[in-house]
């Protein structure tokens, strides 16, 4: 199953998320994911594993397991590279690390511009802005970064461009000035954080949505996120367990199907070959309206990935 983007390209509705994939096993994991049928790989400069993702992709390409035009390779422009003069530089680094000639989709990771950090000083820079732990920002409006991305589409280095972690008001503002409409919005989305009005607005604008952290707190356990302790893991929630039992599916499959049934794409990750396959097979069944509604009642607007926690950045306030 795929979603037709407003750029005319097809995006698989289930992909493999590269966030937190260990560098030591990453190349093998990506290669194995291609072997079992994954075609979309969602990465980012900030994940620090693009070279390894590229190794896995290129091993599969070299062996003829898949052709480049059958893959949908995604990356994200990090906060430190928003200045238009640094956008192409950052994109070229990503293309070089992945060893691909173009990206299928390149997203602005966050609507936040940090001070530029030269690659030789630290790459990926993460939250480092050149002065210890201090956050230093650059006065770069989103539309300026967007214009630079539009040029990269014109140059053939990117097929589709999009945004990630953007609230509705910023999306509306971007649409007023964009020559090329965002093809995709990527958001944190799970039963504890459903964002129905944002989804309704974005879909009404012809923009596709990819959900990350579909398993909710599960995605943030290893980061020792304080809010993880506030809620029951979704895999153990009675509603999810009961729906999974009824459908003869795993809780993970139910959570992923609940999202794809809303018209969203999903990007789960797993290092386990069996789970890799079962996560991919989530569009061969439907949740009943009743089960769908029961899961939808779990919304408590609980956001785990919030820039307010970094430095009181008001992205979602």
From Swiss-Prot:
- Residues annotated as binding NADP(+) are 164-165, 213-222, 269-279
Which pathway does the record list? Carbohydrate metabolism; D-xylose degradation
Entry EC number(s): 1.1.1.307
The entry marks the following residues as binding substrate, namely 109
Tell me one GO biological process term. D-xylose catabolic process
Pfam families the UniProt entry points to = Aldo_ket_red (PF00248)
Record's SUPFAM superfamilies? NAD(P)-linked oxidoreductase
Enzyme category, top tier: oxidoreductase
- Looking at the UniProt record, the site noted as Lowers pKa of active site Tyr sits at 76
Residues in the active site? 47
Name the keywords, alphabetized.
Answer: Carbohydrate metabolism, NADP, Oxidoreductase, Xylose metabolism
PANTHER family named among the record's database cross-references: ALDO/KETO REDUCTASE
Name under which the protein is recorded: NADPH-dependent D-xylose reductase
């Amino acid at each position: 199953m795929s979603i037709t983007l407003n750029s005319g390209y097809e995006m698989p509705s289930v992909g493999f998320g590269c966030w937190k994939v260990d560098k030591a096993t990453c190349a093998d994991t990506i290669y194995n994911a291609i072997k079992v049928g994954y075609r979309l790989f969602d990465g980012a400069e900030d994940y620090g594993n693009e070279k390894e993702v590229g190794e896995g992709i290129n091993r599969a390409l070299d062996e003829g397991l898949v052709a480049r035009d059958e893959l949908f390779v995604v990356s994200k422009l990090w906060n430190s590279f928003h200045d238009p003069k640094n956008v192409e530089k950052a994109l070229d680094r990503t293309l070089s690390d992945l060893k691909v000639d173009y990206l299928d989709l390149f997203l602005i990771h966050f609507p936040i511009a940090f001070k530029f950090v030269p690659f030789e000083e630290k790459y990926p820079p993460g939250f480092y802005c050149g002065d210890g732990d201090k956050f230093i920002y650059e006065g770069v409006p989103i539309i300026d970064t967007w214009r630079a991305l539009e040029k990269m589409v014109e140059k053939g280095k990117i097929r589709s461009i999009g945004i990630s972690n953007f609230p509705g008001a910023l999306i509306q503002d971007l649409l007023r000035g964009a020559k090329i409409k965002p093809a995709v919005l990527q958001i944190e989305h799970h039963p504890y954080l459903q964002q129905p009005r944002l989804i309704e607005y974005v879909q009404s604008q012809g923009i596709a949505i990819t959900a990350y952290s579909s398993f909710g707190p599960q995605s943030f356990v290893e980061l020792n996120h304080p809010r993880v302790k506030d809620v029951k893991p979704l895999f153990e929630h009675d509603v999810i367990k009961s729906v999974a039992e009824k459908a003869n599916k795993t809780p993970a499959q139910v959570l992923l199907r609940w999202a794809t049934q809303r018209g969203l794409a999903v990007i789960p990750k797993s290092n386990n070959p069996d789970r890799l396959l079962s996560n991919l097979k989530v569009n061969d069944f439907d949740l009943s309206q009743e089960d769908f509604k029961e899961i939808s009642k779990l919304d408590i607007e609980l956001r785990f990935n919030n820039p307010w926690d970094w430095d009181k950045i008001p992205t979602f306030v």
